């Protein structure tokens, strides 16, 4: 029995609340159980230097945790004067995930800048961030179409992410903190709505995992992401 009482192949309760804040072109509160991430998407009429004059746009992300998102307070990274390696890794992952489903040429020389701020952490913050950020980006694109900034949507597919792992020899889906901190294997999987893999990050924390374990975790992730994409479509009214 999992600490949450869920079946091995069950996601936590998922909610994707759109228009959560007022000013951003897209804003979503992404909740995976007790993990809550605010994802905002801002449209900027500029591109980074390596895209200037190319006719192409860019999609990028920043990620951070509020000081009391976890059990004990942590200092703001701005107060420390530098980002941790973990923060840099996660925000690059979010950016790569979004760009995997964007036609940057169709975006034109605009940037969609995603900010993912963890309000409360209970495992799976990066996967909640990716899943919510896509919905926020979709709303930002809708705003660009409405305002005449672009003529056609640059979004080619959906993208979502979920964690899987081996806990006491059993493959499980969407780990919360209690499981994540005691698992044998921790893996994050990013996939498109059409079933393509964008990223697979997996590490054995203790006992090495077998090819059969890997296949079982991958199958769990595929099913979980298909369900998350259904949540995204439902949130967007598609």
Curated annotation (Swiss-Prot):
InterPro entries: ExoRNase_PH_dom1, ExoRNase_PH_dom2, ExoRNase_PH_dom2_sf, PNPase/RNase_PH_dom_sf, Ribosomal_Su5_D2-typ_SF, RNase_PH, RNase_PH_bac-type, RNase_PH_CS. It catalyses: tRNA(n+1) + phosphate = tRNA(n) + a ribonucleoside 5'-diphosphate. SUPFAM superfamilies: Ribonuclease PH domain 2-like, Ribosomal protein S5 domain 2-like. One of its GO terms (biological process) is rRNA catabolic process. Its EC number is 2.7.7.56. It comes from the Bacteria. One of its GO terms (molecular function) is 3'-5'-RNA exonuclease activity. Keywords: Nucleotidyltransferase, RNA-binding, rRNA processing, Transferase, tRNA processing, tRNA-binding. It holds the Pfam family RNase_PH. Coiled coil: none annotated. Phosphate binds at residues 86, 124-126. It is an enzyme of class 2 (transferase). Phosphorolytic 3'-5' exoribonuclease that plays an important role in tRNA 3'-end maturation. Removes nucleotide residues following the 3'-CCA terminus of tRNAs; can also add nucleotides to the ends of RNA molecules by using nucleoside diphosphates as substrates, but this may not be physiologically important. Probably plays a role in initiation of 16S rRNA degradation (leading to ribosome degradation) during starvation. Belongs to the RNase PH family. PANTHER family: EXOSOME COMPLEX COMPONENT, EXOSOME COMPLEX COMPONENT RRP41. Homohexameric ring arranged as a trimer of dimers. This is Ribonuclease PH. It comes from Cupriavidus metallidurans (strain ATCC 43123 / DSM 2839 / NBRC 102507 / CH34).
């Amino acid at each position: 029995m999992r600490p949450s009482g869920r079946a091995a192949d069950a996601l936590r309760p998922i909610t994707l609340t759109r228009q959560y804040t007022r000013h951003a072109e897209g804003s979503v509160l992404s909740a995976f159980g007790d993990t809550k991430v605010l994802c905002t998407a801002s449209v900027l009429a500029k591109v980074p230097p390596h895209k200037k004059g190319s006719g192409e746009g860019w999609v990028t992300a920043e990620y951070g945790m509020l000081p009391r998102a976890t059990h004990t307070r942590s200092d703001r990274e701005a107060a420390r004067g530098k980002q941790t390696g973990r923060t840099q890794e996660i925000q690059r992952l979010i950016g790569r995930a979004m760009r995997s489903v964007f036609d940057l040429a169709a975006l034109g020389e605009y940037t969609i800048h995603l900010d993912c701020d963890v309000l409360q952490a209970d495992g799976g913050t990066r996967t909640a961030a990716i899943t919510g950020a896509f919905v926020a980006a979709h709303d930002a694109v809708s705003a660009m179409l409405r305002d005449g900034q672009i003529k056609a949507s640059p979004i080619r597919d959906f993208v979502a992410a979920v964690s899987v792992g081996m806990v006491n020899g059993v493959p499980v889906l969407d780990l919360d903190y209690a499981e994540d901190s005691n698992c044998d294997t921790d893996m994050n999987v990013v996939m498109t709505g059409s079933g393509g893999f964008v990223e697979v990050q997996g590490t054995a924390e203790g006992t090495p995992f077998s090819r059969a374990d890997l296949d079982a975790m991958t199958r769990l992730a595929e099913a979980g992401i298909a369900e998350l994409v259904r949540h995204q479509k439902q949130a967007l009214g598609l």
